[in-house]
Amino acid sequence: MERAVQGTDGGGGSNSSSRSSSRATSAGSSPSCSLAGRGVSSRSAAAGLGGGGSRSSPGSVAASPSGGGGRRREPALEGVLSKYTNLLQGWQNRYFVLDFEAGILQYFVNEQSKHQKPRGVLSLSGAIVSLSDEAPHMLVVYSANGEMFKLRAADAKEKQFWVTQLRACAKYHMEMNSKSAPSSRSRSLTLLPHGTPNSASPCSQRHLSVGAPGVVTITHHKSPAAARRAKSQYSGQLHEVREMMNQVEGQQKNLVHAIESLPGSGPLTALDQDLLLLKATSAATLSCLGECLNLLQQSVHQAGQPSQKPGASENILGWHGSKSHSTEQLKNGTLGSLPSASANITWAILPNSAEDEQTSQPEPEPNSGSELVLSEDEKSDNEDKEETELGVMEDQRSIILHLISQLKLGMDLTKVVLPTFILEKRSLLEMYADFMAHPDLLLAITAGATPEERVICFVEYYLTAFHEGRKGALAKKPYNPIIGETFHCSWEVPKDRVKPKRTASRSPASCHEHPMADDPSKSYKLRFVAEQVSHHPPISCFYCECEEKRLCVNTHVWTKSKFMGMSVGVSMIGEGVLRLLEHGEEYVFTLPSAYARSILTIPWVELGGKVSINCAKTGYSATVIFHTKPFYGGKVHRVTAEVKHNPTNTIVCKAHGEWNGTLEFTYNNGETKVIDTTTLPVYPKKIRPLEKQGPMESRNLWREVTRYLRLGDIDAATEQKRHLEEKQRVEERKRENLRTPWKPKYFIQEGDGWVYFNPLWKAH
């Protein structure tokens, strides 16, 4: 069949980019046009390009009927992209060809070698194409068999074009494979070995020899009687395939059992990296084969009964993938302890719950603020504040590898129970309280003389709040709060430390805790309460108020974690509202995302994303951007901010620096101010002793887990955590049987948000 090419830029134009732009060679419509119309169906090879051919911008290929039958044909997308090869060679330019009809992405060393054997081929059926912030204009293509291409385009436009075409191709072939239906004319579905070119026409495919090696042809016949005969014939063959797969499944189970029966120490253990990879690969292979068998069964069934939908008949064989030890227990939400030299770590994917099987306790008491007013019982917090700055130990790395082998890219980790050794010795609710470690800056907001000064004070406080809440650079995960869990504390701030921004004269201070005032009458009291109000989704609420300064903060946060390969991302969905009752102002703010990087070596944390601060009454707003570190070069923990007066479109303040280091503020009058977060005074929380805390207060609830983590006894900590989880499951089942809805103790749902039951703005 004739293949023709049509250029669109006069035949001799060139792309101004240093790297050649992606181009589509076509005898038909452009990729964008054709994909919008009817999806990908066939490929037009690049041919007849004199002197390298025309260089057209993406999507600019003209549409014209092909010679011969007038049938519109889809182009093959070609162009130069940078591919990440290895750690030593880094990024290298390679010539890529996207074959729409075959559904493959292949690359060559350069354009001249594209008629030779490709250097690499990636099947796009069922592939995932995602964007990445590791490098500029980067995209990652993950095939269904686990292979991966890390690619970079010349610019954002080219990147988006490639992403669009790759995703469309992947979607098209996935739909064709899973939703194939018999057409009105006879056609064949041919399964060829990997890499075999499928150039035969539909007619020639029907006459392929049955004995041809490596070729299996399933023919959809026009005659219903012939279709029924073929169905009976192939159904019997599929029965044989199913029996064979059942045998392989049993062998794979034996393999997994043999691996997991190995001793916990010695030259070969159950956590050997090669054995973990073997387990994961064998399970994934069986799963893929099972999907293929299901597709074949649907095709045979549809050939005989074209009017019925796939799966409508009970005669279709059922095989749902490998039921290996690991896979089966993952689905059931249970997995036995993994042998380890120093720890028995239990983790499981839970059906409808967050990390610690967030479940309910018996119905709480009616809303009551009694625990907030018992401030005479509170004492200065003397808990250890720093996590041990150690990397991942070898046996722990093996456990994490085992965990990663069971996860999929983009998987929601709120449904995964993580190993105990990665947990931080505090609850997420307490971590929110630690964001208030500089209460003097918070209370100074209301002391501002003008709306401009107050919004700038809030931005200063906001940017300095995160470093203490993170407790060092080591990325560890706080306990996921259990529904009904609460945390209470307070701060005493000397009144002479709370001053407006322009008049505040801060002498150099150490980063040690700031001493409390001896006379309570000379201090402001800042109270804090947090509660876990929901477990699906996991929503935490916290409320903070200073009655004397008539200031309060009400916040609700939904944490959503996601697996990103060698890192974990946590989105903080929700918002907070700072109310200055003295001025009648409300500042609505959002929170950044957090990322745990290098989870297999020395994990570290960074913040990322764009957040906003808005005050509708005054017209002031602020935009804060937490910059994540680029793949190559760049600084970590960088943040920039801009405060704007919207009615006049005037920028009144800019800030830049590091959220856990030095921040520099520049005001519109030319003044500058530098804040070093490492030298800011830290005010310790005041918290009641454990013996005076309720059973659902964070430290009392997790006390045994925390104690064993401090002792380094991971086995005992895991056992205590498991005991706590099981207790919550029992209470949850009771609540479900009684159909009793959970009623939070301190917060009330209003619309999509949650509000403290007795806030300062309602009491005054």
UniProtKB/Swiss-Prot annotation:
A 1,2-diacyl-sn-glycero-3-phospho-(1D-myo-inositol 4-phosphate) binds at residues 413-418, 477-480, 535-536, 721, 725, 729. Residues 74-171 form the PH domain. The gene is OSBPL10. This is Oxysterol-binding protein-related protein 10. Residues 1-74, 304-335, 354-391, 501-520 are annotated as: Disordered. It comes from the Eukaryota. GO terms for biological process: phosphatidylserine acyl-chain remodeling. Interacts with OSBPL9. Interacts with DIAPH1. The C-terminal region binds cholesterol, 25-hydroxysterol and acidic phospholipids and is required for localization to microtubules. The PH domain selectively interacts with phosphatidylinositol-4-phosphate. Residues 374-389 have a biased composition (Acidic residues). It is found in: Cytoplasm, Cytoskeleton. The modification Phosphothreonine is found at residue 196. InterPro entries: OSBP_sf, Oxysterol-bd, Oxysterol-bd_CS, PH-like_dom_sf, PH_8, PH_domain. Keywords: Coiled coil, Cytoplasm, Cytoskeleton, Lipid biosynthesis, Lipid metabolism, Lipid transport, Lipid-binding, Methylation, Phosphoprotein, Transport. The modification Omega-N-methylarginine is found at residue 38. One of its GO terms (cellular component) is cytoskeleton. Gene3D superfamilies: 1.10.287.2720, 2.40.160.120, 3.30.70.3490, Pleckstrin-homology domain (PH domain)/Phosphotyrosine-binding domain (PTB). It comes from Homo sapiens (Human). SUPFAM superfamilies: Oxysterol-binding protein-like, PH domain-like.
